[in-house]
Each structure stands twice: as C-alpha cells, then as structure tokens.
Regions:
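Short active-site neighborhood of thiol/selenol oxidoreductases, capturing the structured segment around
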Residues: 52-73
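A short beta-strand-turn-helix
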Residues: 30, 39-59
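Structural microenvironment flanking redox-active thiols in thiol-disulfide oxidoreductases
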Residues: 71-113, 121-127
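Thiol-/selenol-based redox modules, centered on thioredoxin-like
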Residues: 140-183
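Short loop/turn microsegments at loop-to-beta-strand junctions
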Residues: 36-37, 58, 142-144
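Structural micro-motif
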Residues: 113-115, 132-135, 139-146
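N-terminal targeting signals for export/organelle localization
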Residues: 1-42, 183
Length: 183
C-alpha cells in the first residue's frame, strides 16, 4: 500500500514537471521585439510601481515562485551581488511573485535586497507575461526573466532559468544588447 502511494506520488510529480516544461515549449510570453506589457503593482514598500516609470532605462523583469525558498533566495542574492553592475549599465531589477507586500518586505529585510519586489497577488502580471504555474487552487509565478530596453521593447527572454548562474547570464545578455544598440 505504501509503495503504491509512493508510485502514484512519483507519477503525479513527473506529470507536473513535464507539464510545466511543456508550458515553456508552447509559451505565449511576450516575444523579443514586441512592446513589453504595461503593468502597475505594489512594491515591498506598498507603493505602486509601473513599468512606464522606468522609460529610458533598461529593465530586468524577473518572475520567481516564492519568497524564502532556496532557489529564489539564491537568485535574489545573485541579483543583489551584481546590482552595482546593473546600475552602471543603466538597468533596474524588478522581481515579481505572487506573495504580498509584507512577505516581500520581510524577504528584502532578511536577505539584504536593495531592489524592488512587486506583489502580483492576483497573478495578473504573471499571466500577461505567461509566467504562471497553476497548481489548481494555488498559483505561483514561473521562473522567467525579460530584459526590456529603454523604449519598453522586450529584447531578451529567459524561460528555462537556473537560479545560480542566472544573474551572470542576464548581465552578459545586457552587455551584448547594449553593444548591439551602440551603448
């Protein structure tokens, strides 16, 4: 009986993982060269932040599943580690997940994060960017990243993100994009 439950659990988990991977393959995320969907969400300070607030700057818009989880913490730490390099390139980092402002504030305080985390509690922005993992009653933001140019156009999309090397990958892409744009 216990073996049957374990086998069923493994099969369900396998189906979930394959289903998420399948979503990525058929992604309807904003494509490179298209305008980034506009949004307004509250930050960890409970203040509204809109994409258009950053017109004229490069934006690294990264979606992540959940505050205080291992992969999300590693990813956030690495963005924080590299924050000065992003700022030198005229870029801002905006993190988005489904947790509320209070959770984001606690996460930023505990982990020493000095960039904005946005509360997408209704998954509206995650949906706009095709970055939602749906688990029936629960939804989380999928680990996707969009690099948006100063004119609000998507220039790079990362759909299969690994937390550890991700900030370095984004920095390399940003450097390449800026060189191509003559910056």
């Amino acid at each position: 009986m216990k073996i049957t439950r374990i086998a069923v659990g493994v099969l369900l988990l396998t189906g979930l993982v394959l289903g998420i991977r399948g979503m990525r393959a058929d992604s309807k995320a904003p494509a490179v060269g298209t305008p980034a969907p506009e949004f307004t969400l509250n930050s960890q300070e409970a203040k509204p932040v809109s994409l258009h607030d950053y017109k004229g700057k490069w934006v690294v818009l990264y979606f992540y599943p959940k505050d205080f989880t291992s992969g999300c913490t590693v990813e956030a730490h690495n963005f924080q580690r590299d924050l000065a390099q992003y700022e030198q390139k005229g870029a801002v980092i905006l993190g988005v997940s489904v947790q509320d402002e209070d959770s984001h504030q606690k996460f930023c305080t505990k982990e020493g994060l000095n960039f904005k985390l946005l509360a997408d509690t209704k998954t509206e922005v995650s949906t706009l960017y095709d970055s939602v993992m749906n688990f029936g009653v629960a939804k989380l933001s999928a680990r996707h990243t969009f690099v948006i140019d100063p004119n609000g156009v998507v220039r790079k999309v990362f759909l299969d993100v690994k937390p550890q090397p991700h900030s370095e990958e984004v920095l390399a892409a940003l450097t390449e994009l800026q060189a191509a744009a003559g910056k």
